[in-house]
Amino acid sequence: MEKGRPFAHMVEAVNARAWLESTKERGMALGLEHTARAIEALGLPAPTYETVHVAGSNGKGTTVAALGSALHRIGCRHLSFTSPHLVRVEERVRLDGRPVSTAFFDAALADVHAMAARTGLSLTFFEVTLLVALVVAADQRPDVLLLETGLGGRLDATRAVPADLAIITSLSLEHTDILGGTLEAIAAEKAAIARPMKPMFVRDVADQGARRSIQRAADEAGNPEIGEQPAAAQLHWVKIEPEANYFDEARAMAAAAWGSLTCAEKTKFPDFRGLHWPGRMHEVVRAGSGQRWLLEGAHNPSGMETSCRALQHDERWKNPWALLFGSTPQSEMAAMLEPLVNLCRRHPPVAIVLTEPQFGRYPGVPCTELASALGRHDLQISASFAHPQEAVAWVEAQSSTLTDVLCIGSLYLAGNVLQALGADDDEALSIVAKD
């Protein structure tokens, strides 16, 4: 529960929100200088909490969610920073799994806005929301702060925040134009979150080049540009079965790191069978029709492969079901579609509906392109809609014949669909462990 923070004046809140929206025009800016300067300019008190920094190609948000849920189970207060948000920006800053209130977010945002105006710092949307999370953490004083990287690690804004523990989840080829074209290069970027003399837990990887990169980053941990004295990190490899789904991976990574947290070191890692993690294997049952929607974010080829592998034995495919698919641009669209095509061949859907995710960093892939790509696999498209709300309405109109719906692809699409279904209150957007 939030406590103690004064609200921002209404005019301040409106101005700060307008400024936050304008920062989207700056796009993405890799580098630590602006964030480090902003943290210093905010004059926040020295942290009383432990900070956990999580990176990886897939599953990093789920690991944050699993670790946060476990901390909540033993009574440790935690604040998490994750991205992207599905419906509203407050989701990026969760206190004990629940998005902070609009008033609370606005009060912290007003502080960041005032600092930027005073210093003249030009900040991105991601940097601003990270700084909001740090202001909230300074005010709320949780036991643990959980940070999810946005992209990579070495030059991600979250790297400017001091941390006590680092976690790296599964690695795959993604954002190769920025992070490099090999797993070795990508591993080096992500493993740069290693902190001097602090533990770093890494999902074991078979690629020898990637292993060398991670070992080197651990041996040479520390970034003098942000005041760190280089020294070796404490590297721990975590063995996980290659076929593990994201929740199993997240639980294993969280359990491995558990004993390194001061507030958890004398407790056993709590047992829970799953998570309500918005947009990830997220089920919504429609009142009245009983139509079941399953929302799954799978935003790159390896993510789609893992998701479809987890879904292939689901009992719901014995019922008449529909596929709703939309994606942001992919450098390897054919590889992205292959697992989904295989799922459709194994369990043919009654209808395939295409749409274009809205309000994301990148525009959605046009339905015509998706239809052409899927058509090469002899999959027939039932309907296409530029706007997800129209696609949801079409699928709901078929509820008498379509008992189940799989919405998969972009996380932004999951957010669009949650809004269209009216399943976007704080309860729906909170992270909760399932017994």
Where are the language model's segments positioned?
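N-terminal leader/targeting and accessory segments in enzymes
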Residues: 1-58, 62-77, 86-87, 201-202
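ATP-dependent carboxylate-amine ligase catalytic core
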Residues: 12, 26, 32, 36-47, ...
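Residue-level signal for inorganic ion chemistry
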Residues: 20, 57, 78, 146, ...
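Short Gly/Thr/Asp-enriched flexible loops that form oxyanion-binding sites at enzyme active sites
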Residues: 67, 154-164, 418-419
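Acidic, Mg2+-coordinating active-site environments of NTP-dependent enzymes
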Residues: 144-148, 163-267
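Nucleotide phosphate-binding/pyrophosphate-handling subdomain across enzymes
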Residues: 144-147, 157-159, 163-167, 172, ...
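C-terminal helical cap/extension that packs against the catalytic core
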Residues: 207-229, 233-234, 248, 259, ...
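Short, flexible loop segments at boundaries between secondary-structure elements
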Residues: 357-360, 426-435
